[in-house]
Protein backbone atom coordinates (compact mmCIF):
# COMPACT_ATOMS: atom_id res chain seq x y z
CA UNK A 1 0.00 0.00 0.00
CA UNK A 2 1.37 3.44 -0.99
CA UNK A 3 2.27 5.79 1.86
CA UNK A 4 0.24 9.02 1.78
CA UNK A 5 1.84 12.50 1.66
CA UNK A 6 0.38 13.31 5.09
CA UNK A 7 2.00 10.22 6.64
CA UNK A 8 5.38 11.09 5.07
CA UNK A 9 5.19 14.65 6.37
CA UNK A 10 4.28 13.42 9.87
CA UNK A 11 7.15 10.93 9.81
CA UNK A 12 9.64 13.65 8.82
CA UNK A 13 8.46 15.92 11.65
CA UNK A 14 8.87 13.08 14.15
CA UNK A 15 12.36 12.34 12.86
CA UNK A 16 13.34 16.03 13.17
CA UNK A 17 12.08 16.16 16.76
CA UNK A 18 14.05 13.04 17.67
CA UNK A 19 17.17 14.45 16.00
CA UNK A 20 16.79 17.76 17.88
CA UNK A 21 16.41 15.91 21.18
CA UNK A 22 19.50 13.84 20.44
CA UNK A 23 21.50 16.98 19.59
CA UNK A 24 20.39 18.67 22.81
CA UNK A 25 21.32 15.54 24.77
CA UNK A 26 24.77 15.40 23.17
CA UNK A 27 25.37 19.12 23.74
CA UNK A 28 24.33 18.81 27.38
CA UNK A 29 26.72 15.90 27.72
CA UNK A 30 29.61 17.87 26.21
CA UNK A 31 28.91 20.87 28.45
CA UNK A 32 28.65 18.58 31.46
CA UNK A 33 32.09 17.22 30.72
CA UNK A 34 33.46 20.75 30.31
CA UNK A 35 31.89 21.80 33.61
CA UNK A 36 33.55 18.86 35.37
CA UNK A 37 36.86 19.87 33.76
CA UNK A 38 36.31 23.41 35.07
CA UNK A 39 35.71 22.17 38.58
CA UNK A 40 38.90 20.09 38.33
CA UNK A 41 40.69 23.10 36.81
CA UNK A 42 41.54 21.09 33.69
CA UNK A 43 42.52 23.24 30.66
CA UNK A 44 41.14 26.35 32.40
CA UNK A 45 42.68 29.52 30.96
CA UNK A 46 41.21 32.14 33.29
CA UNK A 47 40.57 32.58 37.01
CA UNK A 48 37.85 34.99 38.13
CA UNK A 49 38.74 36.56 41.46
CA UNK A 50 35.73 37.77 43.42
CA UNK A 51 36.71 39.17 46.79
CA UNK A 52 38.85 36.25 48.06
CA UNK A 53 37.21 33.47 46.06
CA UNK A 54 38.91 31.99 42.96
CA UNK A 55 36.55 30.72 40.25
CA UNK A 56 38.23 28.79 37.37
CA UNK A 57 36.72 28.90 33.87
CA UNK A 58 37.36 28.61 30.15
CA UNK A 59 37.44 31.93 28.26
CA UNK A 60 35.58 30.56 25.25
CA UNK A 61 32.63 29.44 27.41
CA UNK A 62 32.41 32.78 29.25
CA UNK A 63 32.70 34.69 25.97
CA UNK A 64 29.89 32.63 24.42
CA UNK A 65 27.56 33.23 27.37
CA UNK A 66 28.36 36.88 28.11
CA UNK A 67 28.79 39.83 25.79
CA UNK A 68 30.78 41.52 28.58
CA UNK A 69 33.37 38.72 28.69
CA UNK A 70 33.35 38.43 24.91
CA UNK A 71 34.54 42.05 24.62
CA UNK A 72 36.99 41.62 27.49
CA UNK A 73 38.71 38.58 25.97
CA UNK A 74 38.60 39.51 22.26
CA UNK A 75 39.84 43.11 22.41
CA UNK A 76 43.08 44.72 23.55
CA UNK A 77 41.92 45.11 27.12
CA UNK A 78 44.48 44.26 29.79
CA UNK A 79 42.31 41.35 30.99
CA UNK A 80 42.56 39.65 27.57
CA UNK A 81 46.16 38.72 28.40
CA UNK A 82 45.74 38.11 32.14
CA UNK A 83 45.28 34.63 33.56
CA UNK A 84 43.57 36.10 36.62
CA UNK A 85 40.75 38.64 36.26
CA UNK A 86 39.41 40.51 39.27
CA UNK A 87 35.69 41.34 39.34
CA UNK A 88 35.13 44.25 41.69
CA UNK A 89 31.88 45.02 43.51
CA UNK A 90 30.57 41.52 42.82
CA UNK A 91 29.16 38.80 45.08
CA UNK A 92 31.12 35.50 44.98
CA UNK A 93 28.02 33.27 45.19
CA UNK A 94 26.28 35.16 42.39
CA UNK A 95 29.30 35.00 40.05
CA UNK A 96 29.64 31.29 40.85
CA UNK A 97 26.01 30.76 39.81
CA UNK A 98 26.46 32.73 36.58
CA UNK A 99 29.57 30.75 35.64
CA UNK A 100 27.70 27.52 36.39
CA UNK A 101 24.87 28.77 34.12
CA UNK A 102 27.35 29.37 31.28
CA UNK A 103 28.17 25.65 31.35
CA UNK A 104 24.79 24.10 32.21
CA UNK A 105 22.10 26.63 31.14
CA UNK A 106 20.55 26.03 34.56
CA UNK A 107 20.15 28.49 37.43
CA UNK A 108 17.88 28.82 40.46
CA UNK A 109 16.09 32.16 40.72
CA UNK A 110 14.32 32.86 44.01
CA UNK A 111 13.25 35.77 46.17
CA UNK A 112 16.57 35.72 48.06
CA UNK A 113 18.87 36.06 45.05
CA UNK A 114 16.76 37.59 42.27
CA UNK A 115 17.87 41.20 42.81
CA UNK A 116 21.58 40.31 42.98
CA UNK A 117 21.27 37.99 39.98
CA UNK A 118 19.45 40.62 37.93
CA UNK A 119 22.06 43.24 38.81
CA UNK A 120 24.94 40.91 37.86
CA UNK A 121 23.23 39.56 34.72
CA UNK A 122 22.64 43.14 33.62
CA UNK A 123 26.24 44.17 34.34
CA UNK A 124 27.81 41.15 32.62
CA UNK A 125 25.21 41.15 29.83
CA UNK A 126 23.93 37.61 30.23
CA UNK A 127 20.51 38.10 28.63
CA UNK A 128 18.89 34.70 29.35
CA UNK A 129 19.48 35.10 33.10
CA UNK A 130 18.27 38.69 32.97
CA UNK A 131 15.05 37.55 31.28
CA UNK A 132 14.53 34.80 33.86
CA UNK A 133 14.91 37.34 36.68
CA UNK A 134 12.53 39.79 35.00
CA UNK A 135 9.92 37.06 34.47
CA UNK A 136 10.27 36.00 38.11
CA UNK A 137 9.84 39.56 39.42
CA UNK A 138 6.83 40.20 37.18
CA UNK A 139 5.07 37.33 38.92
CA UNK A 140 5.98 38.68 42.38
CA UNK A 141 4.68 42.25 41.95
CA UNK A 142 2.25 43.27 44.70
CA UNK A 143 1.24 46.38 46.64
CA UNK A 144 4.10 46.03 49.13
CA UNK A 145 6.94 45.84 46.57
CA UNK A 146 5.74 47.35 43.28
CA UNK A 147 7.34 50.76 43.92
CA UNK A 148 10.70 49.20 44.74
CA UNK A 149 10.54 46.94 41.69
CA UNK A 150 9.76 49.96 39.50
CA UNK A 151 12.82 51.81 40.83
CA UNK A 152 15.00 48.70 40.38
CA UNK A 153 13.76 48.20 36.81
CA UNK A 154 14.53 51.82 35.95
CA UNK A 155 18.06 51.58 37.38
CA UNK A 156 18.82 48.32 35.54
CA UNK A 157 17.18 49.36 32.25
CA UNK A 158 14.42 46.74 32.26
CA UNK A 159 11.55 48.53 30.45
CA UNK A 160 9.29 45.48 30.39
CA UNK A 161 9.57 44.98 34.15
CA UNK A 162 9.10 48.70 34.80
CA UNK A 163 5.95 48.76 32.66
CA UNK A 164 4.51 45.83 34.63
CA UNK A 165 5.31 47.43 37.99
CA UNK A 166 4.02 50.88 36.96
CA UNK A 167 0.79 49.44 35.60
CA UNK A 168 0.25 47.62 38.90
CA UNK A 169 0.98 50.83 40.85
CA UNK A 170 -1.59 52.77 38.83
CA UNK A 171 -4.26 50.07 38.94
CA UNK A 172 -3.87 49.43 42.69
CA UNK A 173 -2.97 52.96 43.77
CA UNK A 174 -5.46 52.98 46.66
CA UNK A 175 -3.58 50.05 48.24
CA UNK A 176 -0.09 51.21 47.23
CA UNK A 177 -0.23 54.68 48.78
CA UNK A 178 -0.92 53.16 52.21
CA UNK A 179 2.36 51.17 52.21
CA UNK A 180 5.71 52.10 53.77
CA UNK A 181 7.32 52.05 50.30
CA UNK A 182 5.13 54.94 49.20
CA UNK A 183 5.86 57.01 52.31
CA UNK A 184 9.60 56.60 51.71
CA UNK A 185 9.58 57.71 48.06
CA UNK A 186 11.53 60.84 47.16
CA UNK A 187 9.67 64.00 46.18
CA UNK A 188 10.42 63.62 42.47
CA UNK A 189 8.82 60.18 42.26
CA UNK A 190 5.79 61.17 44.36
CA UNK A 191 5.19 64.28 42.23
CA UNK A 192 5.41 62.21 39.05
CA UNK A 193 3.10 59.52 40.42
CA UNK A 194 0.39 61.90 41.64
CA UNK A 195 0.28 63.62 38.24
CA UNK A 196 -0.70 60.45 36.35
CA UNK A 197 -4.10 60.32 34.64
CA UNK A 198 -4.06 56.53 34.90
CA UNK A 199 -4.25 56.35 38.70
CA UNK A 200 -7.23 54.13 39.45
CA UNK A 201 -9.21 55.70 42.28
CA UNK A 202 -12.77 55.81 43.54
CA UNK A 203 -12.57 59.60 43.75
CA UNK A 204 -9.96 62.38 43.74
CA UNK A 205 -10.08 62.64 47.53
CA UNK A 206 -7.98 59.45 47.60
CA UNK A 207 -5.20 61.24 45.70
CA UNK A 208 -5.49 64.08 48.22
CA UNK A 209 -5.22 61.56 51.07
CA UNK A 210 -2.07 60.07 49.49
CA UNK A 211 -0.46 63.50 49.19
CA UNK A 212 -1.21 64.44 52.80
CA UNK A 213 0.01 61.06 54.09
CA UNK A 214 3.35 61.49 52.31
CA UNK A 215 3.79 65.07 53.57
CA UNK A 216 2.97 64.19 57.18
CA UNK A 217 5.32 61.18 57.25
CA UNK A 218 8.29 63.56 57.54
CA UNK A 219 6.57 66.93 57.88
CA UNK A 220 9.58 69.09 58.94
CA UNK A 221 11.71 67.98 55.98
CA UNK A 222 8.87 67.84 53.46
CA UNK A 223 7.36 71.23 54.26
CA UNK A 224 9.22 72.93 51.33
CA UNK A 225 7.59 70.51 48.84
CA UNK A 226 4.01 71.06 50.02
CA UNK A 227 2.89 73.30 47.15
CA UNK A 228 4.50 71.07 44.49
CA UNK A 229 2.87 67.94 45.91
CA UNK A 230 -0.62 69.37 46.50
CA UNK A 231 -0.57 71.02 43.06
CA UNK A 232 -0.90 67.51 41.62
CA UNK A 233 -4.23 67.03 43.41
CA UNK A 234 -7.15 67.95 41.14
CA UNK A 235 -9.19 69.88 43.70
CA UNK A 236 -12.08 70.70 41.32
CA UNK A 237 -12.78 66.96 41.11
CA UNK A 238 -13.17 66.67 44.89
CA UNK A 239 -16.73 66.98 46.19
CA UNK A 240 -17.83 70.32 47.61
CA UNK A 241 -18.66 68.66 50.93
CA UNK A 242 -15.21 67.03 51.29
CA UNK A 243 -13.46 70.27 50.34
CA UNK A 244 -15.30 72.34 52.93
CA UNK A 245 -15.37 69.85 55.81
CA UNK A 246 -12.08 67.96 55.45
CA UNK A 247 -9.62 69.73 53.16
CA UNK A 248 -10.21 73.27 54.44
CA UNK A 249 -9.87 72.05 58.03
CA UNK A 250 -6.47 70.42 57.40
CA UNK A 251 -3.73 72.37 59.29
CA UNK A 252 -1.26 71.84 56.43
CA UNK A 253 -3.66 73.70 54.13
CA UNK A 254 -4.67 76.40 56.58
CA UNK A 255 -1.06 77.41 57.24
CA UNK A 256 -0.13 77.73 53.56
CA UNK A 257 -1.68 80.56 51.47
CA UNK A 258 -0.73 78.92 48.14
CA UNK A 259 -2.40 75.65 49.09
CA UNK A 260 -5.44 77.52 50.37
CA UNK A 261 -5.77 79.18 46.95
CA UNK A 262 -5.88 75.74 45.30
CA UNK A 263 -8.73 74.66 47.57
CA UNK A 264 -10.70 77.87 46.98
CA UNK A 265 -10.22 77.41 43.23
CA UNK A 266 -11.62 73.89 43.56
CA UNK A 267 -14.67 75.18 45.42
CA UNK A 268 -15.29 77.89 42.82
CA UNK A 269 -15.35 75.20 40.14
CA UNK A 270 -18.53 73.77 41.67
CA UNK A 271 -20.24 77.15 41.17
CA UNK A 272 -19.50 77.25 37.42
CA UNK A 273 -21.99 76.29 34.74
CA UNK A 274 -21.34 73.04 32.81
CA UNK A 275 -20.27 75.12 29.78
CA UNK A 276 -17.71 77.10 31.79
CA UNK A 277 -16.36 73.91 33.37
CA UNK A 278 -15.62 72.42 29.95
CA UNK A 279 -13.25 75.28 29.19
CA UNK A 280 -10.97 74.19 32.04
CA UNK A 281 -8.36 71.52 31.23
CA UNK A 282 -5.65 69.72 33.27
CA UNK A 283 -6.95 70.25 36.77
CA UNK A 284 -10.37 68.83 35.91
CA UNK A 285 -9.27 65.90 33.76
CA UNK A 286 -10.62 62.77 35.50
CA UNK A 287 -8.41 59.91 36.65
CA UNK A 288 -9.01 56.32 35.65
CA UNK A 289 -12.09 55.24 37.60
CA UNK A 290 -11.88 52.32 39.97
CA UNK A 291 -14.82 49.95 39.55
CA UNK A 292 -16.48 47.26 41.61
CA UNK A 293 -19.33 45.99 39.46
CA UNK A 294 -22.20 44.09 41.01
CA UNK A 295 -25.67 43.25 39.78
CA UNK A 296 -28.49 44.76 41.81
CA UNK A 297 -31.90 43.06 41.97
CA UNK A 298 -34.93 44.76 43.51
CA UNK A 299 -37.99 42.78 44.56
CA UNK A 300 -40.58 44.65 42.54
CA UNK A 301 -43.72 42.92 43.78
CA UNK A 302 -41.80 41.89 46.93
CA UNK A 303 -39.83 45.05 47.85
CA UNK A 304 -38.37 43.59 51.03
CA UNK A 305 -36.32 41.20 48.89
CA UNK A 306 -33.43 43.20 47.37
CA UNK A 307 -29.88 42.00 46.86
CA UNK A 308 -26.52 42.49 45.19
CA UNK A 309 -24.94 39.65 43.22
CA UNK A 310 -21.13 39.76 43.12
CA UNK A 311 -19.82 38.01 39.96
CA UNK A 312 -16.31 37.83 41.45
CA UNK A 313 -17.21 35.35 44.18
CA UNK A 314 -20.85 34.48 43.34
CA UNK A 315 -22.07 35.87 46.65
CA UNK A 316 -25.42 37.46 47.45
CA UNK A 317 -25.67 40.55 49.68
CA UNK A 318 -28.85 42.08 51.11
CA UNK A 319 -29.86 45.66 50.27
CA UNK A 320 -32.05 47.66 52.62
CA UNK A 321 -35.25 48.34 50.64
CA UNK A 322 -37.99 50.55 52.11
CA UNK A 323 -39.82 51.36 48.86
CA UNK A 324 -43.37 50.19 48.11
CA UNK A 325 -43.97 47.24 45.82
CA UNK A 326 -44.51 47.87 42.12
CA UNK A 327 -45.50 45.55 39.32
CA UNK A 328 -43.81 45.75 35.89
CA UNK A 329 -41.47 48.64 36.74
CA UNK A 330 -37.97 49.40 35.42
CA UNK A 331 -34.66 50.41 36.98
CA UNK A 332 -31.42 52.01 35.74
CA UNK A 333 -28.11 53.01 37.31
CA UNK A 334 -26.33 56.32 36.78
CA UNK A 335 -23.63 58.10 38.80
CA UNK A 336 -23.94 56.07 42.02
CA UNK A 337 -27.75 56.10 41.98
CA UNK A 338 -30.30 53.43 41.04
CA UNK A 339 -33.54 54.93 39.70
CA UNK A 340 -36.68 52.78 40.07
CA UNK A 341 -39.49 54.12 37.95
CA UNK A 342 -42.85 53.23 36.47
CA UNK A 343 -44.87 50.20 37.46
CA UNK A 344 -48.21 49.97 39.16
CA UNK A 345 -50.02 48.74 42.25
CA UNK A 346 -53.71 48.89 41.34
CA UNK A 347 -52.89 52.29 39.83
CA UNK A 348 -49.75 53.61 38.06
CA UNK A 349 -47.09 54.87 40.48
CA UNK A 350 -46.03 58.47 39.84
CA UNK A 351 -43.05 58.58 42.19
CA UNK A 352 -39.48 57.61 41.23
CA UNK A 353 -37.56 55.85 44.04
CA UNK A 354 -33.81 56.48 44.13
CA UNK A 355 -31.11 54.46 45.91
CA UNK A 356 -27.59 55.89 46.36
CA UNK A 357 -25.31 52.82 46.46
CA UNK A 358 -22.39 54.75 47.98
CA UNK A 359 -24.35 56.39 50.81
CA UNK A 360 -26.80 53.47 51.21
CA UNK A 361 -29.65 55.97 51.27
CA UNK A 362 -33.13 56.07 49.71
CA UNK A 363 -35.10 59.10 48.57
CA UNK A 364 -37.82 59.93 46.05
CA UNK A 365 -38.16 62.15 42.99
CA UNK A 366 -40.94 62.96 40.58
CA UNK A 367 -41.41 60.06 38.16
CA UNK A 368 -42.21 60.10 34.42
CA UNK A 369 -44.90 62.60 33.33
CA UNK A 370 -46.98 59.69 32.06
CA UNK A 371 -47.16 57.05 34.83
CA UNK A 372 -47.33 53.54 33.36
CA UNK A 373 -46.11 49.97 33.70
CA UNK A 374 -44.32 47.51 31.38
CA UNK A 375 -42.00 50.31 30.21
CA UNK A 376 -38.26 50.02 29.47
CA UNK A 377 -35.49 52.34 30.63
CA UNK A 378 -31.76 52.98 30.21
CA UNK A 379 -29.24 55.73 30.99
CA UNK A 380 -26.81 57.68 28.80
CA UNK A 381 -24.72 60.81 29.41
CA UNK A 382 -26.52 61.88 32.57
CA UNK A 383 -29.98 61.28 31.15
CA UNK A 384 -32.49 58.52 31.87
CA UNK A 385 -34.66 57.48 28.94
CA UNK A 386 -38.01 55.67 29.27
CA UNK A 387 -39.90 54.16 26.36
CA UNK A 388 -43.26 52.59 25.69
CA UNK A 389 -45.24 50.76 28.35
CA UNK A 390 -48.97 50.67 28.95
CA UNK A 391 -51.38 52.51 31.23
CA UNK A 392 -52.60 49.52 33.30
CA UNK A 393 -53.96 47.01 30.83
CA UNK A 394 -54.39 49.37 27.91
CA UNK A 395 -52.62 49.18 24.56
CA UNK A 396 -48.90 49.80 24.33
CA UNK A 397 -47.59 53.36 23.97
CA UNK A 398 -45.31 55.10 21.46
CA UNK A 399 -44.13 57.37 24.28
CA UNK A 400 -40.46 58.29 24.77
CA UNK A 401 -39.37 60.50 27.68
CA UNK A 402 -36.11 61.75 29.17
CA UNK A 403 -35.06 62.69 32.72
CA UNK A 404 -32.02 64.97 33.07
CA UNK A 405 -30.24 63.97 36.30
CA UNK A 406 -28.41 67.32 36.42
CA UNK A 407 -31.46 69.58 36.21
CA UNK A 408 -33.86 67.00 37.72
CA UNK A 409 -36.41 67.69 34.99
CA UNK A 410 -38.45 65.50 32.63
CA UNK A 411 -38.82 66.12 28.88
CA UNK A 412 -40.94 64.43 26.24
CA UNK A 413 -38.92 63.36 23.20
CA UNK A 414 -39.98 62.24 19.69
CA UNK A 415 -42.14 59.11 19.89
CA UNK A 416 -40.94 55.67 18.83
CA UNK A 417 -41.80 54.37 15.38
CA UNK A 418 -43.68 51.43 16.91
CA UNK A 419 -45.87 51.27 20.00
CA UNK A 420 -44.60 48.62 22.42
CA UNK A 421 -44.55 47.39 26.02
CA UNK A 422 -42.70 44.56 27.84
CA UNK A 423 -39.76 45.28 25.53
CA UNK A 424 -36.02 45.73 26.01
CA UNK A 425 -33.93 48.90 25.77
CA UNK A 426 -30.16 49.44 26.06
CA UNK A 427 -27.63 52.19 25.47
CA UNK A 428 -24.73 51.34 23.15
CA UNK A 429 -22.06 53.77 21.98
CA UNK A 430 -24.25 56.78 22.78
CA UNK A 431 -27.34 55.50 20.95
CA UNK A 432 -30.55 54.04 22.41
CA UNK A 433 -31.67 50.65 21.03
CA UNK A 434 -35.22 49.31 21.51
CA UNK A 435 -36.04 45.69 20.67
CA UNK A 436 -39.12 43.47 20.73
CA UNK A 437 -42.03 43.72 23.14
CA UNK A 438 -45.72 43.50 22.36
CA UNK A 439 -48.61 45.71 21.26
CA UNK A 440 -50.37 45.28 24.59
CA UNK A 441 -50.37 43.32 27.83
CA UNK A 442 -53.64 41.55 27.05
CA UNK A 443 -53.76 38.12 25.42
CA UNK A 444 -54.36 39.56 21.96
CA UNK A 445 -51.29 41.81 22.09
CA UNK A 446 -49.07 40.72 19.20
CA UNK A 447 -45.44 39.94 20.12
CA UNK A 448 -42.93 42.04 18.17
CA UNK A 449 -39.61 41.31 16.49
CA UNK A 450 -39.08 44.90 15.29
CA UNK A 451 -36.17 47.04 16.49
CA UNK A 452 -35.32 50.73 16.29
CA UNK A 453 -32.56 53.09 17.40
CA UNK A 454 -32.67 56.65 18.76
CA UNK A 455 -29.88 59.18 18.28
CA UNK A 456 -29.93 61.77 21.12
CA UNK A 457 -27.81 64.17 19.04
CA UNK A 458 -30.36 64.45 16.22
CA UNK A 459 -33.42 63.33 18.22
CA UNK A 460 -34.41 60.93 15.44
CA UNK A 461 -35.51 57.29 15.30
CA UNK A 462 -34.31 54.80 12.68
CA UNK A 463 -35.79 51.36 12.00
CA UNK A 464 -33.33 48.45 12.24
CA UNK A 465 -33.20 44.85 11.10
CA UNK A 466 -35.84 42.83 13.01
CA UNK A 467 -34.96 40.04 15.42
CA UNK A 468 -35.13 36.48 14.12
CA UNK A 469 -37.57 35.56 16.90
CA UNK A 470 -40.41 37.83 18.10
CA UNK A 471 -40.13 38.12 21.89
CA UNK A 472 -41.27 40.04 24.96
CA UNK A 473 -40.20 39.99 28.63
CA UNK A 474 -36.76 39.02 27.41
CA UNK A 475 -33.36 40.10 28.67
CA UNK A 476 -31.53 42.67 26.55
CA UNK A 477 -27.85 43.45 27.22
CA UNK A 478 -24.99 45.15 25.40
CA UNK A 479 -21.59 43.40 25.26
CA UNK A 480 -18.75 44.60 23.01
CA UNK A 481 -20.62 45.95 19.96
CA UNK A 482 -23.29 43.26 20.22
CA UNK A 483 -26.78 43.44 21.71
CA UNK A 484 -27.99 40.10 23.08
CA UNK A 485 -31.69 39.20 23.31
CA UNK A 486 -32.08 36.39 25.84
CA UNK A 487 -35.14 34.15 26.17
CA UNK A 488 -38.54 35.72 26.86
CA UNK A 489 -41.74 34.57 25.20
CA UNK A 490 -43.39 34.63 21.79
CA UNK A 491 -47.04 34.01 20.97
CA UNK A 492 -46.72 30.32 21.81
CA UNK A 493 -44.80 30.32 25.09
CA UNK A 494 -41.39 30.56 26.72
CA UNK A 495 -38.14 30.68 24.74
CA UNK A 496 -34.70 29.22 25.33
CA UNK A 497 -33.12 30.71 22.22
CA UNK A 498 -30.65 33.60 22.27
CA UNK A 499 -29.67 35.94 19.44
CA UNK A 500 -27.43 38.95 19.09
CA UNK A 501 -27.54 42.09 16.99
CA UNK A 502 -24.29 43.00 15.26
CA UNK A 503 -24.27 46.79 15.36
CA UNK A 504 -21.73 47.12 12.55
CA UNK A 505 -23.51 44.72 10.19
CA UNK A 506 -27.13 45.57 11.16
CA UNK A 507 -28.09 41.91 11.40
CA UNK A 508 -29.22 39.36 14.00
CA UNK A 509 -27.59 35.96 14.52
CA UNK A 510 -28.58 33.01 16.70
CA UNK A 511 -26.14 31.63 19.29
CA UNK A 512 -26.26 28.69 21.71
CA UNK A 513 -29.64 28.40 23.47
CA UNK A 514 -30.06 28.61 27.24
CA UNK A 515 -30.21 25.33 29.17
CA UNK A 516 -33.59 26.59 30.44
CA UNK A 517 -36.74 28.00 28.85
CA UNK A 518 -38.00 31.26 30.34
CA UNK A 519 -41.22 33.23 29.92
CA UNK A 520 -39.49 36.12 31.68
CA UNK A 521 -35.71 36.50 31.90
CA UNK A 522 -33.82 38.81 34.27
CA UNK A 523 -30.20 39.10 33.18
CA UNK A 524 -27.26 41.52 33.14
CA UNK A 525 -23.72 41.52 31.76
CA UNK A 526 -20.42 42.16 33.54
CA UNK A 527 -17.39 42.03 31.26
CA UNK A 528 -17.98 39.41 28.57
CA UNK A 529 -20.32 37.25 30.67
CA UNK A 530 -24.12 37.43 30.78
CA UNK A 531 -25.66 36.31 34.09
CA UNK A 532 -29.27 35.10 34.16
CA UNK A 533 -30.15 35.58 37.82
CA UNK A 534 -33.95 35.26 37.89
CA UNK A 535 -36.79 34.19 35.66
CA UNK A 536 -40.16 32.50 35.35
CA UNK A 537 -40.85 29.39 33.31
CA UNK A 538 -44.62 29.48 33.35
CA UNK A 539 -44.98 26.75 35.98
CA UNK A 540 -41.96 27.55 38.14
CA UNK A 541 -39.04 29.91 38.61
CA UNK A 542 -35.36 29.59 37.72
CA UNK A 543 -33.64 27.50 40.41
CA UNK A 544 -29.94 28.25 39.88
CA UNK A 545 -28.11 31.02 38.05
CA UNK A 546 -27.01 30.64 34.43
CA UNK A 547 -23.85 32.09 32.88
CA UNK A 548 -23.20 32.73 29.20
CA UNK A 549 -19.70 33.50 27.95
CA UNK A 550 -20.11 35.69 24.87
CA UNK A 551 -16.56 34.94 23.71
CA UNK A 552 -16.82 31.13 23.77
CA UNK A 553 -20.59 30.86 23.11
CA UNK A 554 -20.92 28.51 26.10
CA UNK A 555 -23.64 28.29 28.76
CA UNK A 556 -23.04 27.09 32.33
CA UNK A 557 -25.80 26.15 34.76
CA UNK A 558 -24.23 26.93 38.13
CA UNK A 559 -25.79 24.38 40.47
CA UNK A 560 -23.98 25.83 43.50
CA UNK A 561 -25.59 29.29 43.37
CA UNK A 562 -29.31 29.74 43.85
CA UNK A 563 -31.15 32.19 41.61
CA UNK A 564 -32.94 35.29 42.94
CA UNK A 565 -36.30 34.11 44.33
CA UNK A 566 -38.49 36.92 42.94
CA UNK A 567 -39.27 36.47 39.24
CA UNK A 568 -40.87 39.92 38.87
CA UNK A 569 -37.70 41.68 40.07
CA UNK A 570 -35.89 44.66 38.56
CA UNK A 571 -32.25 44.25 37.55
CA UNK A 572 -29.29 46.50 36.65
CA UNK A 573 -25.50 46.57 36.90
CA UNK A 574 -24.16 48.98 39.53
CA UNK A 575 -20.71 50.21 40.50
CA UNK A 576 -20.38 49.88 44.28
CA UNK A 577 -16.82 51.20 44.46
CA UNK A 578 -16.71 53.56 47.40
CA UNK A 579 -19.79 52.08 49.06
CA UNK A 580 -19.70 51.56 52.82
CA UNK A 581 -18.26 48.06 53.25
CA UNK A 582 -20.69 47.39 56.11
CA UNK A 583 -23.58 47.59 53.66
CA UNK A 584 -21.93 45.02 51.38
CA UNK A 585 -21.42 42.29 54.00
CA UNK A 586 -23.23 39.09 53.20
From Swiss-Prot:
The keyword Glycosyltransferase does not apply. Residues 146-248 form the BACK domain. GO terms for cellular component: Cul3-RING ubiquitin ligase complex; cytosol; nucleolus; nucleoplasm; perinuclear region of cytoplasm; plasma membrane. Pfam families: BACK (PF07707), BTB (PF00651), Kelch_KLHDC2_KLHL20_DRC7 (PF24681). The keyword Nucleus applies. GO terms for biological process: protein ubiquitination. It comes from the Eukaryota. One of its GO terms (molecular function) is protein homodimerization activity. PROSITE patterns: BTB. It is found in: Nucleus; Cytoplasm. Homodimer. Component of the BCR(KLHL7) E3 ubiquitin ligase complex, at least composed of CUL3 and KLHL7 and RBX1. Substrate-specific adapter of a BCR (BTB-CUL3-RBX1) E3 ubiquitin ligase complex. The BCR(KLHL7) complex acts by mediating ubiquitination and subsequent degradation of substrate proteins. Probably mediates 'Lys-48'-linked ubiquitination. This is Kelch-like protein 7. It comes from Mus musculus. The gene is Klhl7.
